[in-house]
Amino acid sequence: LSPDSDCDRAESDRNDRLSEVKITRTENLSEAQKQSIIRLWNAEYPVQIQHSGIDSFDEYLRPKANLRHYLLIDPDEIIRGWLATFIRDDERWFALLVDGSQQKKGFGTMLLNKVKEFENEINGWVIDRENDVKANGELYLSPIGFYLKNDFEILSDVRIENETISAVKIRWSR
């Protein structure tokens, strides 16, 4: 066997194991879990909304009432995705992240479907323009198509526009 086929086999084995991910629900994150989520956040979201560390992330989480975290964990116990739900303005909202190397494999849908088991409605902000940049210099691609495929509606008349973010409100309901 050539070294290339060994690498291909190792990647195939890893992908097979990733099909064995689990979703864990918790109300409290450990410091290690927070660090993992911050790494994901800073890699996947536009640079202007990055967190400088745990204090910044805690400040983001602090005002959110009735907070629940859903962690997508691979067989190596690595967090590959995070979905948080919380109450804001008397509505259930969510934030979702999936490791870029694991996107387009159904994991984001898995996380959403897990939350849909417990909720009648969830709302979110989604960046719907492609003019933001990620930390690695790549363009941040809007996930709006992903949410449409997962039965969300776009509330185009409800937007957030400020120096940090431009986004439209989305909603899923039973």
Features from the language model and the residues they span:
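Conserved beta-strand in the GNAT
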Residues: 71, 77-86, 92-97
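C-terminal "cap" of GNAT-fold acetyltransferases
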Residues: 129-131, 139-145, 153-174
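A short, internal acetyl-CoA/4′-phosphopantetheine-binding micro-motif in the GNAT/acyltransferase core
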Residues: 95-104, 128-131
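Short amphipathic alpha-helix that is part of the acyltransferase structural core
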Residues: 17-55
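A conserved beta-turn-beta hairpin within the catalytic core of GNAT-like acetyltransferases
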Residues: 87-94, 103, 120-122
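Active-site rim helix/loop that mediates acceptor-substrate recognition in acyltransferases
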Residues: 46-70
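Conserved acetyl-CoA-binding loop-helix of GNAT-fold acetyltransferases
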Residues: 104-117, 139-141
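Conserved GNAT acetyl-CoA-binding A-motif
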Residues: 118-135
